[in-house]
Amino acid sequence: MESGTLSAVLKVVAVVLIGVPLLVFLLQERLIFMPLRLSDAAVADIQTRFAKGKSVFAQAADGTRVHAWHLPGPSDAPLVLYFGGNAEEVSWMLGEANAAPTVGWLLVDYRGYGASEGSPSEETLAADAVLWYDKFAPKENSELQAKKIYVFGRSLGSGVAVRLAAERKVDAVILVTPFDSMTAVGQRHYPFLPVSLLLRHRFDSLSRAPNITAPLLCVVATRDSIIPPEHAKLLYDAWAGPKRWVPLEEAGHNTADAHPNYWRSINLFLNERSS
């Protein structure tokens, strides 16, 4: 190969080796977080269609105004804090929550999602989860208090739920299509990249699991190509508390909730906690 040709090839290789990781590093928020914002008119329309759901706001320590949907349950019912997937606008759960009528629900809008202000990151999602927990946690003289708090995380939300369970006392944890860490999932999908060096939002649930003693329901989709069940199994095996593994046969990552055993297994778990 002539020296000029070799030089050109080396330049192309250098651009690829440096440029691709740099691009991934700079654009990782767009790859991880896919927020769907709601206008004031859309929020009002949702409120009209789901009259039992209440639009609630809280102010974070940095002044950001964050939003959630509160669907009260029966008197003295546990409250489920719901954290959705990376492209999920959670108001759809106002209709789905009727499938689990024995509990109340708090459907959390991440920053930049729904009616919440700001921009999402691992740290802001974690801080806001604690904010919502503290707002509804058992306390005296509060009309919002719940006697028990459960956390429910789906996909990306599993990382938020696990971290909250590690930082606050929760009475039960439900994880749907969860991962061990965002780093491990990213490395699976991008084996040619040094993901551990590039990723700012690690969501390392695996390191927290051995310190969590709350009962766990782990629901996985056997045909999940986005977060293959092997990642959930590592998290499940590391969990310190009582646990149950529910595989949804033939379900994919985005179709788990359509499986006939999805709500059946969730309700069984919830009812066992209440008995």
Where are these predicted regions, by residue range?
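An N-terminal hydrophobic leader/cap segment in hydrolases
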Residues: V9-F57
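Membrane-embedded segments
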Residues: A61-K135, K139, G159
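Short alpha-helix in the alpha/beta-hydrolase fold that links the catalytic acid
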Residues: E96, S205, A214, P228-D237
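Alpha/beta-hydrolase fold nucleophile elbow
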Residues: S142-S155
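Active-site nucleophile loop of the alpha/beta-hydrolase fold
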Residues: V170, I174-A184, H201-S205, A251
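Short beta-strand/loop motif that positions the catalytic acidic residue
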Residues: N211-T213, C218-V220, D224
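Acidic catalytic loop of the alpha/beta-hydrolase fold
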Residues: T222-I227, H253-N254
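Catalytic histidine-centered segment of alpha/beta-hydrolase-like enzymes
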Residues: A251-N261
